[in-house]
């Protein structure tokens, strides 16, 4: 499994994952959501809360300009994380990391800092992602 990690304090965000890209996808699958026209996500293990699923969908929407063949489905085969080392926002960046690495593209940097007062990681660029 691949791994996404952010560590800027005594704790971090860590998500292990396996994702498969299915090109010319046939849209008759359970646990599948259309996140934008002709772009789908399928959860093999339906283990995401609504907030995490939202950030995953936003991560997928953020890369649609780079998709060359439609329809496409991103099948989330496995996801593993410890709730002590997790924030839902991590799903956005985990997907982007996977996509860019899978397509031999440079992974964009992540603007993040740890806020000691709220005991959370803050992702300033995700404030503008609400519209996606």
Task: Name each model-derived stretch.
Residues 1-132:
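Accessory interaction regions appended to the cores of large information-processing enzymes
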